[in-house]
Amino acid sequence: PELNCDEFANIEPRLATPPQLFHEYTVGWSKLCLDKPEIYDFVATVLGEMAEITTGDYLHIGGDEIEDERYKEFVVKADSIVRGLGKTTIGWEEVTQAQVDSTLISQRWNGKTNSVVNTPIIESICSSFYYDHANIPGQEMTNNWCKEDGVSLKDAYTFKVKNPNTIGVEAPVWTEMVLSNEAADDRFWPRTIAMAEVGWSEDENKDYKNFIKRLGEHGLRLDLMDVHYFRTPEVEWNSDRNKGVFSEYMPESRW
C-alpha cells in the first residue's frame, strides 16, 4: 500500500498547503506543511494503521513531484517511521535525494534523479511501464504526458535492465480515465505479459518477434477467461474476436 507523502496531500486539509479541498486530476501543487510538527504524528498514525491491516513487508511513502526546502528531512523521518514498524520503505526515486536508509527501495519512473544513496530499485520507467498510456497512438481515454504516441507492447518488451541494483519491475496504471473492468483489462493486457517476461528474462534471451508469435497463441485462452485485452495489431491472435472491446477508440487506419 502507498501513502502519498507528500505531493498528493489533500487527504487532510488542515495539514496541507493550501487548505482548500481539491477534487480534480492535476498534480504537482499540493503538499503537506512540513513546518508543522503535527505532520509527523499524522504520518506515523496513518502508516501505523496501514502496517496493522496489511501482511506484506513493504509500505510505500510516495514522495514524487514535490519541491520543498524541508523535503529531505521529511523523507528521512518517514523512512524511519516505516522501519520502526518493521516494514521496508518504498518511495518514488526522488526520495533518494535524501540520506535515507540503504534498505529503502527506490521506484524509478523517469530515471533522472541524482541519488545520494545506493538502494535497491524497482523499474517503472514511464516510457515502458506506465500502462495508463495508450496502447497505440490516438487511443482515447488514455494519458500521453510521458510518451506522446503511447506505450506500445514493443516499448514494454524491449526495456533493458541496466542497473545491477534492480530487483524487479512494476507497471502502474492510474485510473482517472479507467472507468470499468473492461477498460482496466485493455490497459493491463497484453502489456503486462511483456513486462513479466522482462522481469524473468536476461536481455540476451529476449526476442520480440518470437515473443509476439508466442503471445498470439494465447488469444483464445484470454478470450475464454473473459479478459478484454487490447488486440495489438501486430500480433497474429489465434482467436476469432476481430477487435478489442475499445476498438472504437482507435484510428481506423491502424486496422
Descriptions of predicted regions:
Residues 1-81, 95-100:
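Aromatic-lined carbohydrate-binding surfaces of glycoside hydrolases
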Residues 99-104, 109-255:
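Flexible, acidic glycine-rich loops studded with aromatic residues
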